[in-house]
Each structure stands twice: as structure tokens, then as C-alpha cells.
């Protein structure tokens, strides 16, 4: 039986992963000269209407966009603009493709053309507003931001940009009133606006007002890295170092590693003098774009957020966290070399340099260049002891099957954490998996139970520990309880529903297994493992024709090395997966209390 790789299962430990859906367009044309002379042929080609050329460019651009080539899409959309019907619509597409390909200057040129053609698209107006702010044309920026119709997401960005424009022209008080007038009453939208309000107060030196805003947001459980960093800076600069460290450590535990947060935490802990960063209007405006875009990226599986990261960087080229997320968006779209190019522009002086090197290593690995990835990883580790980078590289080692190196590096991180009185459940989870892969189940089990004690409510962890026990025939009631709870927490997560079904299968309850495995395949129809498991369940319930269909389908989905022969053998003789029963267990690790609330 093939299970998920550690990299796929440990969502909290790896870089943010997204799938970009793409369609394929088959376009075939054929023509024959039919014996035309050179003159006849020339007349035919010269007589081709300009509109036909435009539609040709439009189709090429559409195909390029569908097949994830925004640079070619932008080029051919631009060629189609002047002569095609519905010109402004094509110009809008050309702008999106230009920004998606990272060509801001071309994007501005196309946005101007689209505006001339009468486009009222939000992205056109935002692009022109950003350019006007960048070059100091305040009146043009005001017109684009205040005389345009925006949906909720773009309206939030437009109001943030306008607020920083107001700071520059009318002062802080006017900007704060402007933001207050735009509050929606929805905490999900207003928290970003309130953080922006605090940053504006801080930029003007109104630190008491800024702290009041930040304290209120923190107590409401709002967590925004740039705002939390500013909050901690203010506290530390006033001598409240313990409170600042408490906030930064809580952010790390609840949200995860952030390079800027980690650097600030280290500086405060080392007793360094903390300098409060006062944002310029351009830097603030860049954050007004970046913050909603980062939130969008965490909630969607498309590449729209990448367009906004490019706009933010046009205003503040030093906003390296935007480069990091932009590159991640490119990697999600399998545009590996472009992602590496974006990351290569992060300088060594940046807090995100180490993170960027880890991302480069991952991009190389995912594009099939594992040796280059390992070389970059080794170089990065030699250059920096950054904890976030170490975690990225440990993940990389697991992905390429170097479990011993992964285990050693994770042990080093855990040991260093202990010296700072910190325990991160994700690290014990990862090391437990690596130790299990290395055949050291007792130590792996100890790590996994430690992770459970620290974090009893993570669906991925509950699923992994529960399935591991089922697979070994140990603590079966406890194991099934964990898997069921994971499935209740994540009912639309295919691999968790698969685990629930496969656990029932291993225990001989084939009818229940079939129900869950069918649901898992509905959720993840392109997964070879899930289709393979469903085939086994069908076979055991007498549905042998359907079983063979699922196994054949699994073979078309690129199963892992070694799995193809096993699946092909089942097409001849059926499955041979042994049932499990409660195994004899020794003293072993102490199980935690029942996981049911």
C-alpha cells in the first residue's frame, strides 16, 4: 500500500501549496495552396482582414493564458488590442497577463491604452492609481481611486491607497477619519483596515494611539505579521521587552514562522536597541496592496494575488515579503524558473534572504533538479542558522528521501528550541514521521504523542497518528477515534477521508470502507492512491468489474515508483492486503487521554 509522502501530509510544515487549474485548448488549422501561383498567394494573404489577424492573436493569447504562459499571452493580447472588436475587454486581459508575467512597465502601458478605450475594469484603475502615486501625480491618483467602481476586495485596496495619499496631503488625522468612515462592521475585513490605521498613527509618531489600536487588535485575536511586528517594536522601544517577546512568540506558535518576526524576536532577546520603523506614504501604500493580496492567496487556489504583489513592489521595491509570496504563487503554477528569478532579487541584507534561498531549493526540487536543490540547501544552511530556513531544508530532505539528514536537522532545531524554552508541535510531528520512516517506531511514536499533547486538535496529526496505529494493529479503538475526529474536522479533505475508509478496510469492514473511499475519490478524483484503495474495496464487496476500472484509472494517474507493478498484478489476481487485529503492545509510550472533547 502506498501512502502519502511526508511533504504532502505535513501541511503546517511546508510552504504554502496551491493548485492552479488549467484547461487545454486544441487548435488545429490546415490549408492548402491548391496550386496557387506566388502572385495569387500574395493576393490571398494581403487581402486577409486586419480583424482576422486580431482574432488570430486573440486565440493565441487565450491559449497561452490557459497553458500558463502569461508572457506570450500579454504579447498577443497587446497585438490584438488596436483592431479587435470589444477592444477594452482585450486590453483588460492584456493588462492582467502583463502583470502576471511580472512586466509592470508593459502593464502600465496597456492600462493607459485600456483606459483610453473606455475600460472601467478595477485592475486598470488600480494600476493607473499605483503608477500615479509612484511618480507623484496625486490628482491623477485621486481620480482613479475615488471616481471608480470597485468590488469589496478592490475597494479595500483602493481605500488603503487613498488613506496613505491623504496622509501625504492632509495629514494623519484626516487619514484616520477616512479609514474610520470605511469600516464595514465585518471583523474579517476591518482588522486589516485597523492595522493600517495603527501603522498610519505610528508613521506620524503618534505612538500612544498606535499602541491602543494594536493592543485592541491583539486582544481580539487578529494576527497580521506586519502589524504584530510594529506592535512589538513599539513595546520594546518603550522598555516592555517581555511583553513584546510574549506577543512575538505567541504569533510564531499560532501562525507560524515569519522571517521579520524571527529577526525582531532575536534582536529583542539579545538586548539590542530596537528602532521603530516609521513608514513613508509609498511604503504604507505598498502594504495597503500587499496585506489583502496575502490574505487572498491564503484563501484561493488561483494566481490573481501575484498581480497585486507586482503592484505593491512597484511602490516599494524593498518589500521582500511580497517577493517571497509572489515566487510562491509562481511555484504553485509550476513556473519554476520565473519563481527562482523573483527570489534571486532578494538581497543578503533582507530578513527574507534565508527564506528565499530555501524557496529556491524547493523550486529546484519540484522541477526535477534534486541535486541542485540539495546544493543550494547546503549553501544556504552554511550561510545562515535561520530557524525557518532549517525547517524548510528539513522538509526538503524528507521530500528527497534523506530521512537521516532530516531527523538530525530536526533534532538540532528542537534542541535549540528547548534552550529558549520553546516547544513546537510541528517539529515533533515531522521528526516522528522521519523516525518512523527510518524504522525507529518507539522513538517516532514518542515524538508523535508529544506533538499530540502540544496540539490535540490538528486534523492532519490526528489522522497520521491514528492511521499509524491501525496499520500496526495497535490501540485500535483509540486510533479509529482519532481518525474519525480528523474526518469530522476536515470532511472535505480527500486524504483524511481515504484514511478513514482504508482503516475500515484493514479491519475487514468493507461496506463501510467503500462508502468512505467513494467519497474520498469524489474529493480527489486525480489521486492514484485513492483510486487504488477504492478498487480494493470494490473487489472485496464483489464489484470486480468496477474494481478493475479503478485500478486501470489509477495506472493512468502516474502512480509512484514501484506501485505500477503491484497494481497491474491486482488486475490479474486481485488484492492481497492483510487484515489487522489488535497487536500485543508492551510498555511503550503513554497514550494521551481520549481525544474526544
What are the roles of these predicted feature ranges?
Residues 1-14:
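N-terminal secretory signal peptides that target proteins for export/translocation
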Residues 3-5, 18, 232, 553:
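Positively charged, low-complexity intrinsically disordered regions
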Residues 5-6, 20, 316, 473:
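Hydrophobic residues within membrane-embedded alpha helices
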Residues 14-21:
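Sec-dependent signal peptide recognition
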Residues 28-30:
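C-terminal motif of bacterial Sec signal peptides marking the signal peptidase cleavage site
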Residues 32-35:
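Bacterial signal peptide processing site
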Residues 41-66, 72-597:
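Alpha-solenoid helical repeat scaffolds
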Amino acid at each position: 500500500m502506498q501512502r502519502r509522502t511526508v511533504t504532502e501530509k505535513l501541511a503546517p510544515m511546508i510552504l504554502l501549496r496551491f493548485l492552479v487549474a488549467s484547461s487545454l485548448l486544441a487548435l488545429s488549422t490546415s490549408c492548402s495552396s491548391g496550386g496557387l501561383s506566388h502572385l495569387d498567394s500574395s493576393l490571398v494573404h494581403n487581402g486577409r482582414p486586419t480583424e482576422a489577424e486580431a482574432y488570430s492573436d486573440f486565440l493565441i493569447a487565450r491559449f497561452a493564458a490557459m497553458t500558463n504562459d502569461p508572457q506570450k499571452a500579454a504579447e498577443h493580447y497587446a497585438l490584438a488590442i488596436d483592431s479587435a472588436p470589444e477592444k477594452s475587454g482585450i486590453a483588460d486581459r492584456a493588462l492582467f497577463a502583463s502583470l502576471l508575467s511580472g512586466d509592470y512597465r508593459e502593464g502600465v502601458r496597456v492600462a493607459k491604452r485600456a483606459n483610453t478605450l473606455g475600460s472601467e475594469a478595477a485592475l486598470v484603475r488600480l494600476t493607473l492609481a499605483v503608477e500615479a502615486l509612484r511618480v507623484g501625480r496625486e490628482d491623477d491618483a485621486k481620480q482613479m481611486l475615488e471616481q471608480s467602481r470597485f468590488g469589496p476586495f478592490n475597494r479595500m485596496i483602493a481605500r488603503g491607497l487613498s488613506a496613505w495619499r491623504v496622509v501625504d496631503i492632509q495629514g494623519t488625522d484626516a487619514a484616520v477619519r477616512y479609514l474610520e468612515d470605511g469600516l464595514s462592521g465585518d471583523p474579517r475585513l476591518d482588522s486589516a483596515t485597523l492595522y493600517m490605521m495603527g501603522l498610519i498613527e505610528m508613521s506620524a509618531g503618534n505612538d500612544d494611539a498606535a499602541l491602543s489600536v494594536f493592543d485592541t487588535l491583539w486582544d481580539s485575536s487578529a494576527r497580521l505579521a506586519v502589524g504584530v511586528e510594529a506592535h512589538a517594536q513599539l513595546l520594546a522601544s518603550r522598555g516592555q521587552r517581555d511583553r513584546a517577546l510574549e506577543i512575538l512568540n505567541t504569533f510564531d506558535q499560532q501562525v507560524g514562522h515569519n522571517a521579520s518576526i524571527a529577526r525582531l524576536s532575536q534582536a529583542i532577546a539579545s538586548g539590542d536597541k530596537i528602532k521603530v520603523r516609521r513608514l513613508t506614504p509609498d511604503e504604507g501604500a505598498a502594504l495597503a496592496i500587499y496585506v489583502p493580496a496575502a490574505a487572498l492567496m491564503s484563501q484561493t487556489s488561483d494566481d490573481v494575488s501575484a498581480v497585486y504583489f507586482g503592484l505593491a513592489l512597484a511602490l516599494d521595491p524593498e518589500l521582500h515579503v511580497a517577493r517571497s509570496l509572489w515566487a510562491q504563487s509562481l511555484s504553485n503554477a509550476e513556473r519554476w524558473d520565473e519563481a527562482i528569478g523573483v527570489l534571486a532579487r532578494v538581497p543578503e541584507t533582507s530578513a527574507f534572504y534565508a527564506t528565499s534561498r530555501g524557496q529556491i531549493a524547493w523550486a529546484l526540487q519540484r522541477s526535477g533538479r534534486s541535486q541542485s536543490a540539495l546544493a543550494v540547501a547546503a549553501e544556504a544552511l552554511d550561510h545562515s542558522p535561520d530557524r525557518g530556513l532549517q525547517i524548510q531544508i528539513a522538509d526538503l530532505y524528507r521530500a528527497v528521501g534523506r530521512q537521516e539528514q532530516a531527523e538530525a536537522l530536526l533534532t538540532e532545531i528542537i534542541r535549540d528550541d528547548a534552550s529558549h524554552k520553546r516547544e513546537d508541535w510541528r517539529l515533533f510531528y515531522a521528526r516522528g514521521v522521519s523516525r518512523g520512516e527510518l524504522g525507529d517506531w518507539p522513538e517516532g511514536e514518542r515524538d508523535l504523542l508529544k506533538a499530540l499533547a502540544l496540539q490535540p486538535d490538528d486534523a492532519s496529526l490526528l489522522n497520521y497518528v491514528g492511521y499509524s496505529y491501525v496499520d500496526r494493529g495497535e490501540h485500535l479503538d483509540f486510533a479509529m477515534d482519532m481518525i474519525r475526529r480528523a474526518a469530522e474536522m476536515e470532511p472535505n479533505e480527500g486524504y483524511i477521508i481515504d484514511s478513514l475508509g482504508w482503516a475500515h478496510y484493514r479491519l475487514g469492514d468493507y461496506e463501510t470502507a467503500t462508502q468512505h473511499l467513494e467519497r474520498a475519490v469524489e474529493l480527489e478524483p486525480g489521486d492514484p492512491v485513492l483510486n487504488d484503495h477504492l478498487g480494493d474495496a470494490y473487489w472485496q464487496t464483489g464489484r470486480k468489474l468496477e474494481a478493475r476500472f479503478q485500478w486501470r484509472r489509477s495506472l493512468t494517474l502516474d502512480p509512484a515508483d514501484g506501485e505500477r507493478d503491484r497494481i497491474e498484478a491486482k488486475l490479474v489476481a486481485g488484492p492481497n492486503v492483510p487484515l489487522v487485529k489488535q497487536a500485543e503492545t508492551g510498555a511503550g509510550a503513554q497514550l494521551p487521554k481520549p481525544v474526544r472533547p
